[in-house]
Structure formats: C-alpha cells, structure tokens
Amino acid sequence: LVAGELAPAAGSIACSSRPYYVPQHLSAAGISAVGVLGVADKLDALRAICGGSADPRCYDILADDWDVEARCRAALDHWGLPHVGLTDPVDALSGGERTKLCLAGISVHNPSVILLDEPTNHLDTSGRRRLYDLIRASRATIVVVSHDVALLNLLGTTCELSAKGLKVYGGNYDFYRERKRIEEEALAQQVDSEQTALRLARKKAQEVRERQERRMRQGERHKDQLPRILRRTMKDS
C-alpha cells in the first residue's frame, strides 16, 4: 500500500515524497539493470544528447542530472556488482544480486523514504554488512519488514501488526521483546487474579447457598415439631 502497488480499500495514504521500494521478490522478466534502478529514460536522454541530439524533450527528461550514469556505475560497484552492465538483463542475476541491484538504487536516488521488504533474505555476509552500514548512516525514513534480528535492532521504532491493529513500540527489536515480555507477564497476572477472584466468588456463592439450605432445613424441622408440642401441651392441661 505505501509503495503504491496496491490501492487502499478505504481512506488514503499521504507521503511527503515518493518512497523507494526494495521488494522481497523482483519480477525481472525483460528488465535491464537501469530499468530496475529507474533511470532508463534518463540514460537514453543522456546518450541522445551526448550523440548530438538537441531535442528539448531529452533535456527535460535528464533534468540536469548529468552524472546519473556515473552514480549508477559507482552504486553497482559499491554493492559488489562490478560485473553487471547497466543494460544487462536482470533475469540473468541471482536472487542476491537482484536485491543488491535494488539496494544500489538508494545511492542513485537518495530518497527520503525507503521501504525494505525482507531485504536480507538473499544477501551474503558482505551484502548484509553493507546494508547495515547504509541504515546506520542514512538520515532517511526507513520502513523495514524483516525476520533479521540484527537488522531490526538497528531501527529506532518497532511496529507490531496483529488482528487487533498496529501497535507502535518506541525502540528496537530487543526493546520490543522486553516490552512484550512485560505485557505478557502483566496479562498473565491479570488472568490469574481474575481466575482467583472468580474462584472466591464461586466459593462465596456456594457458602451462601449452603447457609440458605441449612436455614430451610431448620425451618422445616420446626414446622414438623410444632404440632407435637401443641398436642403435648394440651394433654398436660
């Protein structure tokens, strides 16, 4: 929804700038590296201009981003992809290389909002280290969905999504786990207290019923005894 791939069923999502999205699984059929990086049109415009074109549309597309090709090349090299050409097809890359290619786009675009969906699933050790370093150094708003505890501990806020809705915890994953432990212990104590109170209430109700039953039995005995007392009194008189 935040990435804009799905429309919300109700309400709306507002973002100050277009988020940069790194998907868990990249559909790569027929896409080149620059297509994944989102700069194919700019590179085409740059090459047209360098080839002598004076078409104003090319200048509009490039938007004075003259070093876009150099940034792309530097980003691929940084992520351990020096062997990947900008026009190479992505379907020839491994899962880890595709993830690195998507992550390289962060350096190309320098976005203010980054969405990462299970980004370390296919990364090797060096790739994970580069990602951790990126997150430590970044000033962007980064939203991560991950099972990687080391990654989650680099983030300042943890959100838990459940059937009850979204709950925000003001800390990293270790902080979240500690808060959850405290909440679960408090809930267990509350349940235990409620069960104890219920047992006491049932015991009290049972005692009340037993007292009422004793009084009723005593009342019945008094009724049975009253006629005999009256007859005995009449005989004595």
Q: Locations of the language-model features?
A:
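Conserved catalytic motifs of ABC-family nucleotide-binding domains
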Residues: 110
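Catalytic Walker B motif of ABC-type/P-loop ATPase nucleotide-binding domains
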Residues: 114-118, 123
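Conserved catalytic loops of ABC-family nucleotide-binding domains
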Residues: 134-144, 152
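Flexible nucleotide-interacting loop at or near the entrance of a catalytic core
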Residues: 52-67, 82, 186-237
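ABC-family P-loop ATPase nucleotide-binding domains
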Residues: 25-95, 101, 195
